[in-house]
């Protein structure tokens, strides 16, 4: 009913950029023939949690899986990005409603340490060393290959450079990725080992074919594994990168940054949208508590970033509180302490903390001068969309500044006495800590920063058009949010017609009364659940959590503020679903998108980004790819309307559920309209 209301009574703003056709992409000729050709049934690009989940399920299904990753660790946000503190919601965690692979990860962490929370942190029930996360996940993939009789081809330090996209004569409505060229780098003899230099100093080299002073390069061509007979698709490429590289390189329709305000995205901070304002990214680091005070050297660049740093809120203005928030190792429990209503154990020598703090090492650019993820227009102007010209799609200078910003934050923690948000007299130095660096440090880098920044937002595809979604499928703010949409903000900032449409969409069966004018928005009762999708293949639950971009350039400018209105949409969300339609891009039939690049809005993406969601979406992608190969169909055929009549879709969902990969939360039904007890 809600979908029909959308279709009949509204259209999305005309500011959306849509590409209706895709020009065939021919591989540019590398400087030499590929050094090796590798056959895959599933090419999973990106070794984060979504990619790991996809590979895990593909291997258990007996498939040949090629997994590429720009760093040399699997796990993404819980390993190479350093955020080794599982973001979970209480009810889902208590009932353990997670995909089987994620549950196995939690169990292996517990077995490895003898407890689930070796860091005794208070942000999560599980904080641990990032490198251990990588080791555990790598072991899980190897075991999955043995158990499912699949084949794992693991390609660390590898990036996709080019794609060949053509029409497949065996079927489908669009084109397909026929092959991919990748570059793998390894240290030259006599050169510094991997992870010596921060990402900003090596990323452009990683996307360059030629050997360099640091790296030898291996050119790899990925191709489909041959089948006995013609298939609708010979293989599947799964987009699981942290920024949506493949959707940019393949040039399928996508969005970036803030979406225009509409009745579907009523809390948007912009009426027209802004592709440059994405959520902040973070280079994490680890610091260890010492028994004696340490001497800390002032970074040359500290004065540039010092005006930014803050505890943010008075109730959080305590060093021990911030330190223990994401403490990842605590061999000896300290005394109990309470500050701002929060209780924790004080740090003791040998404790290790991972830092990830909004007004600390978050770097939050938001203008065309410094945005991290290049827009399509910027990529086109730079020539990165031309064959063989792809360089990763990120602004190297912004990566560099994010690295400096993070190192400066450590110095502020141990030596600083300023606070940009709370003023003088709040921050005092605490020199009993060292910055951990070295290949044997928790981050596994000589420089001490995470191998890759923690990314909260990426390019997000626009799903396929249909009768109900004429502008392309998208999960929007109102599909998951618990906000009170009768708040004065919405009455003031939405037109009367838009305000009425908003409440009609939230009203379920009563929506037509509102649209006809038979009832006012205030007279109807809004639904108290997220939107239910008949093609749901996964689940997630987290708050709509914002780390907004800053208003002015540069982000660290003294007196700079967060983008006005960006936090309006934040708050609690209902448990939500991962529909198959959110994973299928336009134009390309054998590309499945997972992780942070699925078709969700800017505000919804603030919830669709945590560890268990990434795994669930990855498990859905890997299972869908394996199912499509076995059933000799294309994934979009599973959701051709009417979806409710798709027997193959139901078979896919039944396979996921039978494999303990939930497609719904318990008691999900249009008749269960109250999820207020879920926290």
PLM regions: where:
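Bacterial N-terminal signal peptides
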Residues: 11-23
């Amino acid at each position: 009913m809600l979908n029909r209301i959308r279709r009949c009574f509204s259209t999305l703003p005309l500011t959306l950029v849509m590409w209706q056709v895709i020009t065939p992409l021919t591989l540019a000729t590398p400087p030499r023939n590929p050094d090796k050709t590798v056959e895959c049934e599933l090419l999973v690009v990106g070794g984060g949690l979504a990619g790991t989940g996809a590979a895990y399920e593909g291997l258990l299904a007996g498939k040949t899986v090629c997994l590429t990753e720009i760093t040399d660790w699997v796990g993404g946000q819980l390993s190479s990005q350093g955020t080794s503190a599982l973001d979970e919601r209480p009810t889902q965690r208590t009932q353990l409603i997670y995909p089987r692979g994620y549950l196995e990860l939690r169990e292996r962490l517990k077995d490895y340490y003898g407890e689930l929370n070796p860091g005794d942190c208070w942000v999560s029930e599980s904080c641990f060393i990032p490198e251990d996360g990588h080791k555990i996940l790598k072991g899980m993939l190897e075991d999955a290959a043995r158990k499912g009789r699949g084949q794992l081809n693991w390609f660390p330090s590898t990036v996709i450079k080019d794609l060949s996209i053509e029409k497949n004569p065996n079927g489908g409505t669009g084109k397909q990725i026929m092959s991919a060229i990748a570059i793998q780098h390894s240290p030259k003899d006599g050169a510094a080992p991997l992870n010596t230099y921060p990402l900003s100093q090596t990323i452009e080299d990683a996307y360059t074919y030629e050997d360099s002073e640091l790296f030898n390069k291996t050119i790899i061509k990925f191709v489909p594994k041959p089948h006995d007979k013609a298939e609708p698709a010979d293989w599947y490429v799964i987009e699981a990168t942290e920024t949506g590289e493949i959707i940019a390189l393949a040039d399928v329709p996508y969005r970036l940054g803030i979406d225009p305000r509409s009745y579907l995205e009523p809390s948007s901070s912009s009426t027209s949208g802004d592709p440059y304002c994405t959520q902040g990214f973070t280079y994490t680091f680890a610091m260890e508590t010492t028994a004696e005070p340490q001497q800390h050297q002032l970074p040359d660049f500290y004065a540039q970033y010092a005006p930014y740093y803050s505890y943010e809120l008075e109730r959080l203005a305590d060093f021990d509180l911030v330190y223990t928030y994401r403490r990842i190792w605590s061999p000896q429990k300290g005394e109990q302490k309470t500050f701002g209503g929060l209780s924790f154990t004080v740090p003791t020598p040998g404790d290790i903390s991972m830092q990830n703090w909004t007004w600390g090492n978050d770097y939050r650019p938001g203008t065309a001068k410094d945005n991290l993820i290049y827009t399509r227009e910027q990529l086109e102007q730079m020539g990165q969309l031309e064959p063989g010209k792809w360089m990763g799609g990120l602004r190297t200078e912004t990566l560099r500044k994010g690295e400096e910003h993070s190192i400066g934050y450590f110095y502020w923690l141990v030596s600083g006495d300023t606070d940009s948000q709370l003023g003088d007299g709040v921050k005092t130095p605490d020199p009993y800590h060292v910055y951990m660096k070295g290949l044997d440090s928790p981050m596994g880098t000589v420089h001490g920063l995470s191998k890759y920044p923690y990314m909260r937002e990426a390019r997000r595809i626009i799903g396929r058009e249909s009768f109900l979604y004429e502008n392309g499928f998208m999960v929007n703010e109102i599909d998951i949010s618990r906000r009170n949409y009768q708040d004065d903000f919405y009455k003031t900032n939405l037109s009367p017609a838009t305000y009425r449409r908003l409440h009609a969409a939230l009203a379920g069966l009563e929506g037509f009364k509102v649209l006809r004018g038979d009832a006012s928005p205030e007279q109807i009762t809004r639904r108290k659940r997220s939107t239910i999708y008949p093609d749901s293949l996964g689940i997630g639950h987290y708050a709509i959590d914002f780390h907004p971009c800053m208003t002015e350039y540069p982000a660290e400018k003294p007196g700079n503020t967060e983008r006005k209105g960006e936090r309006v949409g934040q708050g609690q969300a209902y448990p939500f679903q991962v529909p198959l339609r959110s994973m299928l891009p336009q134009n390309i039939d054998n590309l499945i998108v997972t992780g942070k690049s699925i078709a969700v809005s800017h505000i919804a993406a603030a919830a669709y980004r945590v560890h268990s969601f990434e795994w669930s979406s990855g498990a859905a992608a890997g299972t869908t790819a394996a199912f499509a190969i076995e059933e000799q169909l294309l994934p979009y055929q599973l959701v051709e309307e009417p979806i409710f009549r798709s027997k193959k879709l139901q078979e896919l969902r039944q396979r996921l559920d039978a494999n303990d990969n939930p497609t719904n939360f318990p008691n999900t039904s249009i008749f269960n309209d109250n999820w207020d007890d879920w926290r």
